[in-house]
C-alpha cells in the first residue's frame, strides 16, 4: 500500500513517520493511498472504498477530525481523506517524481526541527520546575510517618492495602524529583464542562447504608457533593464516552494490521505504547485537577499522588475500553488482542494487564463506580513522601463512603466494594511490573528512552530522568 519512500541527500531513507497523519494528526506509518496517514485512517479509507460506503453527518458537515474524535463522524472523516488527496488509484502511480521527493524531504526536515525545538523547550521547563519544587520537597520528609488507619464500609473499618509505588523508596532516600508535573501547566483536555449533575438531588440512596452510620464530622450532603463532583469530572475527562466505545466495540484490527504491529521493532512498539500511555495520563491529570478535594491538597501532595497513582488510574480506566467477550482492548482507534503487543517482549506484563481488565469487567461497574474507584485509587494516603497524609486519608474515606452508597444502590451483592479493594494489590503489582520492564528496556535502549519517549512518561516512570532532563 505504501509508495516508495523518498531518499534523503545524506543518510538513506527519510523518516516519513516523523510527519503526523494528515487526516487526524496521529503518528503516521507512511504514505497510504497517496497521503501520509496513520494505520487507522489508512484502514478506514480502505474499508470505505471496498464497501462503497455512504456516510451521513449528524451535525453540519464540518466536524473536527483529530486523533481523539476521528471515529465520531465517518462522513467528515472520509471527506477530509478525499480533500487531502487519498485515492484508490494512488497505489498505481509507481515511483515518486524528483519534485515530490524533494518536497517530502523538506517537510520531513521541518518536522524534525520542530520536534527538536519541542524537546529543548520541554527540557527547559522541567529544569525550571525542578528549581521551584526542590526546596519544598527536600526538607522535612525523611521522618514522615505515613501510617494511616482504614476506611468504613457497612459500618465496619476496612484496612486498605498499602501501595508500594513505583520507586521502592526507603526512608533514607531523598524525595523523588517532581519536575515533570506542573499542576498549572497541563493542557486542558476539555475547556468547557459538558455534564451538569448539580440539578440531580440526592444522587445516592443513603437509606441502604447500614444504620446510616458515618465517620464523625462527615455529613451526607458532603458525601453527595464530593461524589457528584468526582463523577462529573470523570465523565468530562474520559477519552471516549461509553456510547462511542459501544459503537467501536466490534471494530477490530485486521489480520494485516495485527501482523504490522507484530513486525514492528521492539523499540518502535515501546515508543508507540509510551505515547498512548502518556496521552491517557494527561486525561487522568485533568481528571484529578477537577476534583475539588484534590485541588485543596498542598501542591507537593498533588504531584506525588499523580506520579505514584496515575498509571493505576489508567489501568482502572482500561476496563471501559476492554471487550471481555473477545479479550480485546481499544488501541489506536480499534480493538485488538494480546498478540498485537508481541513485539514488546513483555508477554507477562501484557497478560497481567489483560487479566486485570477482564476481572474488573466481570464486576460490571457503572460509570459512577469507575469514577469513584479511580479517585480512591489515586488519592491514597499510603504514598511515600506525602506532607499531609492524614488530609489525604480523610478525603479517601469520603470517596469510599460515596462508592459504598453507589454500590449498594446498583448491586445486590454487598461484597462488591470488598472485591474492588482486594484488587488494589493487583493494580499496584501490574504497575510495578511495567516499571521493571521499562528499566530492562532502558538498559538495552537508553538513547531511545532518553530522546524519543514523551518527557512526561520519562518523568513519571524513569527514576533517573532528572539527570536526563537537566
Curated annotation (Swiss-Prot):
Basic and acidic residues biased stretches? 104-117
Q: Does the keyword Magnesium apply?
A: no
Subcellular location as annotated: Nucleus; Nucleus, Nucleoplasm
Which UniProt key words apply to this protein? Answer: Activator, Biological rhythms, Developmental protein, DNA-binding, Metal-binding, Nucleus, Receptor, Sensory transduction, Transcription, Transcription regulation, Vision, Zinc, Zinc-finger
Query: Which BP terms does GO give this entry?
Result: amacrine cell differentiation; cellular response to retinoic acid; eye photoreceptor cell development; negative regulation of DNA-templated transcription; negative regulation of osteoblast differentiation; positive regulation of DNA-templated transcription; positive regulation of transcription by RNA polymerase II; regulation of circadian rhythm
Q: Where is this region: Disordered?
A: 104-127
* Gene null: resulting phenotype: Mice are blind, show juvenile ataxia, duck gait, hind paw clasping reflex as well as delayed onset of male fertility. They suffer a degeneration of the retina during postnatal development with severe defects in photoreceptor cell morphology. Mice display reduced anxiety and learned helplessness-related behaviors. They also show a significant increase of the circadian period. Knockouts for isoform 1 display duck gait and lack amacrine and horizontal cells with an excess of ganglion cells in the retina.
Give the residue ranges of motif AF-2: 456-461
Give yes or no: UniProt keyword Metal-binding.
yes
SMART domains documented for this protein: HOLI, ZnF_C4
Q: Which Gene3D superfamilies match?
A: Erythroid Transcription Factor GATA-1, subunit A (3.30.50.10), Retinoid X Receptor (1.10.565.10)
Top-rank taxon: Eukaryota
* Triggers of expression: Induced by aging in bone marrow.
Cellular component terms, GO, for this chain's entry?
nucleoplasm; nucleus
Annotated DNA-binding ranges come to 18-93
Q: What tissues express this gene product?
A: Expressed in inner and outer neuroblastic layer as well as in the ganglion cell layer of the developing retina. Expressed in bone marrow osteoprogenitor cells.
Family annotation (Pfam families):
Hormone_recep, zf-C4
Q: Where are the zinc fingers (NR C4-type)?
A: 21-41, 57-81
Which residues does the UniProt record annotate as the domain NR LBD? 222-460
| Assembly with partners or alone | Monomer. Interacts with CRX.
**Which family would the database say this protein is a member of?**
Belongs to the nuclear hormone receptor family. NR1 subfamily.
Tell me, what does this protein do in biology?
Nuclear receptor that binds DNA as a monomer to ROR response elements (RORE) containing a single core motif half-site 5'-AGGTCA-3' preceded by a short A-T-rich sequence. Considered to have intrinsic transcriptional activity, have some natural ligands such as all-trans retinoic acid (ATRA) and other retinoids which act as inverse agonists repressing the transcriptional activity. Required for normal postnatal development of rod and cone photoreceptor cells. Modulates rod photoreceptors differentiation at least by inducing the transcription factor NRL-mediated pathway. Isoform 1 is critical for hindlimb motor control and for the differentiation of amacrine and horizontal cells in the retina. Regulates the expression of PTF1A synergistically with FOXN4.
* Record-given protein name: Nuclear receptor ROR-beta
In the record, what lineage is assigned to the organism producing the protein? Eukaryota, Metazoa, Chordata, Craniata, Vertebrata
In the UniProt record, the gene name given for this protein reads Rorb
Amino acid at each position: 500500500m505504501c509508495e516508495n519512500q523518498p531518499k534523503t541527500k545524506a543518510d538513506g531513507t527519510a523518516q516519513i513517520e516523523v510527519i503526523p497523519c494528515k487526516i487526524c494528526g496521529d503518528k503516521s506509518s507512511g504514505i497510504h493511498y497517496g497521503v501520509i496517514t496513520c494505520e487507522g485512517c489508512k484502514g478506514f479509507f480502505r474499508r470505505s472504498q471496498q464497501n462503497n460506503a455512504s456516510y451521513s453527518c449528524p451535525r453540519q458537515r464540518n466536524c473536527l477530525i483529530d486523533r481523539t474524535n476521528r471515529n465520531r463522524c465517518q462522513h467528515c472523516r472520509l471527506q477530509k481523506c478525499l480533500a487531502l488527496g487519498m485515492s484508490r488509484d494512488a497505489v498505481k502511480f509507481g515511483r515518486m517524481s524528483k519534485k515530490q521527493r524533494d518536497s517530502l524531504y523538506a517537510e520531513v526536515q521541518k518536522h524534525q526541527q520542530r520536534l527538536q525545538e519541542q524537546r529543548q523547550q520541554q527540557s527547559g521547563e522541567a529544569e525550571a520546575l525542578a528549581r521551584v519544587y526542590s526546596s519544598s520537597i527536600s526538607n522535612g520528609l525523611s521522618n514522615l510517618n505515613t501510617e494511616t488507619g482504614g476506611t468504613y464500609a457497612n459500618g465496619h473499618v476496612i484496612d486498605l492495602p498499602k501501595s508500594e509505588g513505583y520507586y521502592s523508596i526507603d526512608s533514607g532516600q531523598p524525595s523523588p524529583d517532581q519536575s515533570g508535573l506542573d499542576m498549572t501547566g497541563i493542557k486542558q483536555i476539555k475547556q468547557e464542562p459538558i455534564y451538569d449533575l448539580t440539578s440531580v438531588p440526592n444522587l445516592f440512596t443513603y437509606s441502604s447504608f447500614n444504620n446510616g452510620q458515618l465517620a464523625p464530622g462527615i455529613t451526607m450532603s458532603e458525601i453527595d457533593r464530593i461524589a457528584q463532583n468526582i463523577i462529573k469530572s470523570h465523565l468530562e475527562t474520559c477519552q471516549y464516552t461509553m456510547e462511542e466505545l459501544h459503537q467501536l466495540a466490534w471494530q477490530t484490527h485486521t489480520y494485516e494490521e495485527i501482523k504490522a504491529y507484530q513486525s514492528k521493532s521492539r523499540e518502535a512498539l515501546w515508543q508507540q505504547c509510551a505515547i498512548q500511555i502518556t496521552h491517557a495520563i494527561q486525561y487522568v491529570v485533568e481528571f484529578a485537577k477537577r476534583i475539588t478535594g484534590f485541588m485543596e491538597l498542598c501542591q507537593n501532595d498533588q504531584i506525588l499522588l499523580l506520579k505514584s497513582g496515575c498509571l493505576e488510574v489508567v489501568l482502572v480506566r482500561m476496563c471501559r475500553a476492554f471487550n471481555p467477550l473477545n479479550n480485546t482492548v481499544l488501541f489506536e482507534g480499534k480493538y485488538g488482542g494480546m498478540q498485537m503487543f508481541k513485539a514488546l517482549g513483555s508477554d507477562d506484563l501484557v497478560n497481567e494487564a489483560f487479566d486485570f481488565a477482564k476481572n474488573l469487567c466481570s464486576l460490571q461497574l457503572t460509570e459512577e463506580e469507575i469514577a469513584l474507584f479511580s479517585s480512591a485509587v489515586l488519592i491514597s494516603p499510603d504514598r511515600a513522601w506525602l506532607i499531609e497524609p492524614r488530609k489525604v486519608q480523610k478525603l479517601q474515606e469520603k470517596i469510599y463512603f460515596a462508592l459504598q452508597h453507589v454500590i449498594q444502590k446498583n448491586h445486590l451483592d454487598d461484597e462488591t466494594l470488598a472485591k474492588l479493594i482486594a484488587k488494589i494489590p493487583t493494580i499496584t503489582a501490574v504497575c510495578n511490573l511495567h516499571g521493571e520492564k521499562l528499566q530492562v528496556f532502558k538498559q538495552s535502549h537508553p538513547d531511545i528512552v532518553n530522546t524519543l519517549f514523551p518527557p512526561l512518561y520519562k518523568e513519571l516512570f524513569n527514576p533517573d530522568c532528572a539527570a536526563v532532563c537537566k
